[in-house]
């Protein structure tokens, strides 16, 4: 189980979901696929800020690799996925990974 998050470059918040976030949590690579998924599923208005925060905080905190996607699909926490984004069925049904 690799808990390692590396955010390469996050564009300005509120831009298109094209920021390069390379994060690896629990052996699942979260590259451009995750950005497209998280932007559509979690950030309703496509806010990279929420997506970046959710991915970064969750990965650093534990094995919740898809915080932005998992947490937002449930409670709409806009990237504050501290405990909701569990990398299981939630992530799968949301991102389709």
From Swiss-Prot:
Residues 1-25, 63-97 are annotated as: Disordered. GO terms for biological process: sorocarp development. It comes from the Eukaryota. Residues 63-75 have a biased composition (Low complexity). Pfam families: Coiled. Residues 84-97 have a biased composition (Gly residues). Belongs to the hssA/B family. This is HssA/B-like protein 35. The gene is hssl35.
